[in-house]
Every structure is written in C-alpha cells, then in structure tokens.
Amino acid sequence: MSPRKTYILKLYVAGNTPNSMRALKTLRNILETEFRGVYALKVIDVLKNPQLAEEDKILATPTLSKILPPPVRRIIGDLSDRERVLIGLDLLYDELADNAFSSG
C-alpha cells in the first residue's frame, strides 16, 4: 500500500463573518473526517492580508485552493456540500482511485 499524499490547502475568508466561519467549520469537518494527519490548512483573512489575496488572484470569498498535490484547484463560494468540495478539488477521485488499486 502506497503512503497517502499530503494535501496543502488555503482557505481565503473575509473576516469573521457567519459565511466565513461556516466555510471553515465545514472544511475542518471534511478534512478531519477524510484526511486526518495528511493535510495542512492555512486560513487567510483577505481583510487583514489583502496583498496575499492579490498575489493569488482571489476575487471572492470564501475561496478554497488545493495547492498540493498538483494540479492546483479552487472552489469559490459555498463549501457546505461535502461531495462538491471533494470532487471540485479532485480529492474524491484520488481517494477512490487509491482504494480501487490497493484493494486488489
């Protein structure tokens, strides 16, 4: 069985708004359930760090970016749909493919 990949993610939020807090809570729940111990999440408040948002060309919040493993993927807006988040970031496909190959 191959070692699991490490996932590097960035979540861009705009302050402590209910929408930002909900996105963070939902994302942490997904990550702790599906990727415990194999992820790093950096939360960036674009109101406090506008230069980071500008450098990464973030135009709306919340935005979730998967940096590693490549390719970079982004989801903009509502993160409450677990399956949409996993598919949008190519995480669900990776995990299903790994399980299919390791079970045979």
From Swiss-Prot:
Listed InterPro entries: Circ_KaiB, KaiB-like, KaiB_domain, Thioredoxin-like_sf
Alphabetical keyword list: Biological rhythms
Keyword Membrane listed: no
Pfam families according to UniProt: KaiB
GO annotation (BP), single: circadian rhythm
Family membership noted in the UniProt record: Belongs to the KaiB family.
Family matches, as HAMAP family: KaiB
Subunit composition and interactions: The KaiABC complex composition changes during the circadian cycle to control KaiC phosphorylation. Complexes KaiC(6), KaiA(2-4):KaiC(6), KaiB(6):KaiC(6) and KaiC(6):KaiB(6):KaiA(12) are among the most important forms, many form cooperatively. Undergoes a major conformational rearrangment; in the free state forms homotetramers as a dimer of dimers. When bound to the CI domain of KaiC switches to a monomeric thioredoxin-fold (KaiB(fs)). KaiB(fs) binds CikA, leading it to dephosphorylate phospho-RpaA.
PANTHER family in UniProt: CIRCADIAN CLOCK PROTEIN KAIB2 (PTHR41709:SF2), KAIB-LIKE PROTEIN 1 (PTHR41709)
Role, per record: Key component of the KaiABC oscillator complex, which constitutes the main circadian regulator in cyanobacteria. Complex composition changes during the circadian cycle to control KaiC phosphorylation. KaiA stimulates KaiC autophosphorylation, while KaiB sequesters KaiA, leading to KaiC autodephosphorylation. Phospho-Ser-431 KaiC accumulation triggers binding of KaiB to form the KaiB(6):KaiC(6) complex, leading to changes in output regulators CikA and SasA. KaiB switches to a thioredoxin-like fold (KaiB(fs)) when bound to KaiC. A metamorphic protein which reversibly switches between an inactive tetrameric fold and a rare, thioredoxin-like monomeric fold (KaiB(fs)). KaiB(fs) binds phospho-KaiC, KaiA and CikA. KaiA and CikA compete for binding to KaiB(fs), and KaiB(fs) and SasA compete for binding to KaiC, thus the clock oscillator and output signal pathway are tightly coupled.
Protein name according to UniProt: Circadian clock oscillator protein KaiB
Provenance organism: Parasynechococcus marenigrum (strain WH8102)
Classification of source organism: Bacteria, Bacillati, Cyanobacteriota, Cyanophyceae, Synechococcales
